[in-house]
A protein has these predicted regions:
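Residue-level signal for inorganic ion chemistry
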Residues: 11, 37, 91, 107-108, ...
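Conserved core of the sugar-phosphate nucleotidyltransferase
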Residues: 113-208, 236
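N-terminal glycine-rich phosphate-binding loop and ensuing alpha1 helix
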Residues: 2-64
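Hydrophobic helical membrane-anchoring modules
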Residues: 216-236
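Short beta-strand segments
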Residues: 10-14, 55, 106-107, 136-138, ...
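Short, low-complexity, intrinsically disordered N-terminal peptides in bacterial proteins
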Residues: 1-7, 66-70, 186-189, 230-236
Length: 236
């Protein structure tokens, strides 16, 4: 039985595989004979996470449960078809009431190869007193801001920019308060927060950073999947 003192997690996996050219949910696409979902859940557990709630497409819940049958203390619930933000809120509700200081992580199944050390760093930072923590990488490309017409309007200093990954970690009370404050945005993907740290920022919270990892790539397009398969084959 899980303890309230254990870190818990919401693993978002309700996305489609359309940009990968797949008819199945993206989280069920396989790497080395196992779905992305399984790899992501295994990585969370290895990093020190206890209970995990997975948000899945309503039509695929049984497939998801079957894919995770060899991982304990994990449950699958229906996610939202409106936004990731709303899916996370449903996952938090499924975790039930938690102590205010409980550490809760939010991770994307689309980042199946996140090293356990990244998860552990996030947990350690929250345990050390941070209310919200995100793993980040330096930006290597030059970035531009553009107008709706496509004209360049500015060049931000690259040294001030980072690329954000998951899992993101929070004190339970901080994340719940942030989701409650931003709940009205979740009904529309165009308005919804693209990550949970953004909701914390919106209520005036401080978000801290830890080092991410290049292996925590997000599988979105076919090239991402090809690279992830090479990395997974090397791990298997």
């Amino acid at each position: 039985m899980s303890s309230q003192s254990e870190p818990c997690a919401v693993l978002t996996a309700a996305g489609s595989g359309s940009r990968l050219g797949c008819e199945c949910p993206k989280a069920l696409v396989e790497l080395s004979g196992r779905p992305l979902l399984w790899w992501a859940a295994r990585g969370l557990r290895a990093g020190g996470v206890g209970p995990i709630v997975v948000t899945a497409p309503a039509s695929s819940i049984e497939e998801f449960r079957s894919a995770l049958s060899d991982i304990d203390d994990i449950s699958v619930v229906s996610g939202s078809d409106r936004s990731r933000q709303e899916s996370v809120a449903l996952g938090l509700a499924a975790l039930g009431e938690r102590n205010a200081a409980t550490i809760v992580l939010v991770h994307d199944a689309a980042r199946p190869l996140t090293p356990s050390q990244v998860t552990a760093r996030v947990i350690d930072a929250v345990r050390g007193g941070a209310g919200a923590v995100i793993p980040v990488l330096p930006v290597t490309d030059t970035l531009k801001t553009v107008s709706p017409s496509g004209a360049v309007t500015g060049t931000p200093r690259r040294s001030n920019m980072v690329a954000v990954q998951t899992p993101q970690g929070f004190r339970w009370d901080v994340l719940i308060r942030a989701h409650e404050a931003g709940a009205s945005l979740g009904a529309d993907e165009a308005a919804a927060a693209t990550d949970d740290a953004g909701l914390v920022e919106a209520i005036g919270g401080t978000v801290h950073t830890v080092a991410g990892d290049e292996r925590s790539l997000k599988v979105t397009r076919p090239l991402d999947l090809a690279l992830a398969r090479l990395l997974a084959d090397a791990e298997a």
